[in-house]
């Protein structure tokens, strides 16, 4: 090996040999660690001391996105013990392999069909809309979203008289519902086949704590809540952008979504779905489609944020109050129609959900007294605690 000159701290030039690198040369063929069986009768395994060169490491790191690798965690109710179920195959396990989301149909005004790895739906009956806050309508399907995943309802319809708000579905037994905001001052009917959309399931991703700034810890479903810090007053027909003191650093292959909560979808407020870019403050745009002033109390959960390893895109809709539509990619997780699945037997009925929503809405309307102004104030503040 040739010698080289090195500059020491004492500023004296001395001759020294090039230290031997623990990595291979760039031009050498990359080799992996291999296992070789010993010739001895003990059958011990000896690891061949072979390293991997830097070029191979860089190429492997660029081709493989380590943060998109997700292993489904099994909860206590999802674990399948073969010792307790002898003689049964994997087909009877709580979650099929490869992973597919179990679902079943329910009587409703919608027709649901399985289309590749998504559930496509459209209305088969006329849907009547009024100016009053209507009870959400079931989409006619119940599904079980496993832990570590989330679902999203994406609507393909865009009309000047109404708007269908997307919804994030947490990891549990779910009965997706339709939330429609009437943009007209009169009663109207939505003809069959007008409302159509898809339901997709995607993996959740929880960034490291050092990647998040001023974000509270997520809930058990890996959703982050975004709350207002002060009172917001939005005039009739006005649009206001609400910023939250929260941000996150760039993470390769990660996408963040912000979607409004259902409490606002049932009112005359439209919270535009947003793709949260890294290095920017979280924010949502709120549109007041009513003829009254709306007051949002402090510490009110306006939207929920979720991180995923799939890329979502925007579809601008021009002058429509929705502003933009989120277009999800093709999910990797499919569905399987298993009406007799054990996890679907405990699904709450849509009627029970509607009753609970109505009770919560009645209590939230009495949370605070109206403000004395010339306009009518509709308070959508936090819900009061339930007293026995």
Swiss-Prot record:
Keywords assigned: Hydrolase, Magnesium, Metal-binding, Nucleotide metabolism, Virion
| Region (Disordered), start-end ranges | 77-96, 336-388
In terms of superkingdom, the source organism counts as Viruses
Q: Does the keyword Magnesium apply?
A: yes
* Protein transport is among the record's keywords: no
Give the required cofactors.
Mg(2+)
Which residues are connected by disulfide bridges in this protein?
none
Pathway, per Swiss-Prot/TrEMBL? Pyrimidine metabolism; dUMP biosynthesis; dUMP from dCTP (dUTP route): step 2/2
Q: Where in the cell is it found?
A: Virion
Q: What are the GO BP annotations of this UniProt entry?
A: dUMP biosynthetic process; dUTP metabolic process
Catalytic activity reads: dUTP + H2O = dUMP + diphosphate + H(+)
InterPro entries from the xrefs?
Answer: dUTPase-like_sf, Herpes_Orf11, HSV_DUT
* Principal location listed in the UniProt entry: virion
Where are the compositionally biased (Acidic residues) regions? 351-363
Q: What's a single GO MF annotation on this record?
A: dUTP diphosphatase activity
State the protein's purpose.
Involved in nucleotide metabolism: produces dUMP, the immediate precursor of thymidine nucleotides and decreases the intracellular concentration of dUTP to avoid uracil incorporation into viral DNA.
What protein name applies here? Answer: Deoxyuridine 5'-triphosphate nucleotidohydrolase
Q: Which organism is it from?
A: Human cytomegalovirus (strain AD169) (HHV-5)
Lineage of producing organism:
Viruses, Duplodnaviria, Heunggongvirae, Peploviricota, Herviviricetes
């Amino acid at each position: 090996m040739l010698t080289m000159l090195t500059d020491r701290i004492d500023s004296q030039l001395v001759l020294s040999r090039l230290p031997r690198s623990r990595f291979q040369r760039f031009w050498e063929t990359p080799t992996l660690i291999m296992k070789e069986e010993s010739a001895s009768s003990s059958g011990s395994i000896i690891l061949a001391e072979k390293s991997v060169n830097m070029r191979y490491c860089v190429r492997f790191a660029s081709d493989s996105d380590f943060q998109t690798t997700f292993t489904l965690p099994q909860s206590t109710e999802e674990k399948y013990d073969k010792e307790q179920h002898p003689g049964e195959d994997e087909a009877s396990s709580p979650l099929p392999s490869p992973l597919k989301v179990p679902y079943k149909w329910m009587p409703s005004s919608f027709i649901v069909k399985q289309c590749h790895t998504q559930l496509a739906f459209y209305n088969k009956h006329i849907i009547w809309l009024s100016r009053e806050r209507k009870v959400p309508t079931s989409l006619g399907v119940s599904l079980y979203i496993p832990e570590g995943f989330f679902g999203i309802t994406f609507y393909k319809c865009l009309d000047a008289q109404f708007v269908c708000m997307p919804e994030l579905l947490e990891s549990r037994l779910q009965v997706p519902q339709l939330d429609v905001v009437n943009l007209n001052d009169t009663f109207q009917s939505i003809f069959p086949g007008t409302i159509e959309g898809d339901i997709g399931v995607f993996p959740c991703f929880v960034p490291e704590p050092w990647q998040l700034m001023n974000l509270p810890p997520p809930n058990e479903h890996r959703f982050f809540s975004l709350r207002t810090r002060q009172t917001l007053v939005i005039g009739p027909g006005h649009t206001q952008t609400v910023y939250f003191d929260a941000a996150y650093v760039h993470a390769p292959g990660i996408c963040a979504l912000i979607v409004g909560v259902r409490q606002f979808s049932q009112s005359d407020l439209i919270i535009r779905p947003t793709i949260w870019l890294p290095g920017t403050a979280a924010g949502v745009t709120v549109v007041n489609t009513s003829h009254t002033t709306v007051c949002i109390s402090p510490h009110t959960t306006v939207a929920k944020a979720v991180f995923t390893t799939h890329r979502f895109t925007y579809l601008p809709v021009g002058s429509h109050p929705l502003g933009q539509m989120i277009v999800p990619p093709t999910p990797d997780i499919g569905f399987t129609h298993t009406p007799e699945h054990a996890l679907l037997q405990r699904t709450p009925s849509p009627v029970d959900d509607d009753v609970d929503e109505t009770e919560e809405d009645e209590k939230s309307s009495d949370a605070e007294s109206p403000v004395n102004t010339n306009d009518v104030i509709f308070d959508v503040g936090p819900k009061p605690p339930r007293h026995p």
